[in-house]
Swiss-Prot record:
The organism of origin for this protein: Rhodopseudomonas palustris (strain BisA53)
EC number: 2.7.8.13
GO biological process per UniProt: cell division; cell wall organization; peptidoglycan biosynthetic process; regulation of cell shape
Name listed for the protein in its UniProt record: Phospho-N-acetylmuramoyl-pentapeptide-transferase
Entry keyword set: Cell cycle, Cell division, Cell inner membrane, Cell membrane, Cell shape, Cell wall biogenesis/degradation, Magnesium, Membrane, Metal-binding, Peptidoglycan synthesis, Transferase, Transmembrane, Transmembrane helix
Major location category of this protein: membrane
Primary gene name: mraY
UniProt entry tagged with the keyword Cell division: yes
Amino acid sequence: MLYWLVDFASSVPALNVFRYITFRTGGAMVTGALFVFMFGPWIIDNLRLRQGKGQPIRSDGPQSHLSKKGTPTMGGLMILSGLVVGTVLWANPLNPYVWIVLAVTLGFGFVGFYDDYLKVTKQSDKGFSGRTRLAIETIIAAAACYALMRLGRDPLSSSLAVPFLKDTAIYLGWFFVIFGGFIVVGAGNAVNLTDGLDGLAIVPVMIAAASFGLVSYLAGNAVFADYLQINYVAGTGELAVLCGALLGAGLGFLWFNAPPASIFMGDTGSLALGGMLGTIAVAVKHEFVLAVIGGLFVLEAVSVIVQVASFKLTGKRVFRMAPIHHHFEQKGWTEPQIVIRFWIISVMLALAGLSTLKLR
């Protein structure tokens, strides 16, 4: 909403500052952080009161996790609240990319919220049917990708950009909806699998958000896109504001999620944030780069796929436990060791992913 102050810039020249995406991104980040810092304790107290026993802890998981019994979940509500407030205040409300990404984020968040609700009320680690959840996610993601395809109305909007090769894109046509939907759903569930230790998921999410905030800004700027020889997608620069809001809300959440966590993100947050990152990657035509920047999420998801496939085919497990962060727990790594080392890996992968912008 603050973007509309630009209309009064002719009378008050200082209001021209609201034209700049960089300024509004910073404002969204500060707003998101302050909102979570201010209302976080109230949200935690209410969730603890309403949930009673909190998130159920798996009996077949690492024994060290039993000490976390009673910790409330659905902390994603804190992040999403800060994200929405920061976005609504600072983003251009007339930009369709903002609303498409926000719709996917909240849609996935609702799916995750319902899953968390069932787990808490039933005191079981099983939410609602995995197939049903996947079907709903696919519908939301496919609808968003269709909207993105129609929004562009040019061959690029239905194409897959290839890293390292300038002016190279694979035209997918209507298959873009399926491919893009797969990216969004895959990203959502990959982040969901990563969220297994205090602070493990939120920092890599923030690192990826900061990276894609930069990618969005560059891809949405004709001058920078031409210089870097990446695909120019008009209007996507505004997505940097959403990334800023997520970064701020994530910092606020980390304050309460740092070990020992006062609240868990839950599926409410992990599905929503993963879906958001996937949608932004599809919008700015950097789907392959998401696999690099979000490589930690890919690793976690692949470890589960390999574990399940190996057990079904051979009756043997590749890892002591999946996702892979539990494997390292079983090997004797402490929780802080795993979390901080995975953060370091995320930083390195983000730098590697950003370096591809200049490799053409």
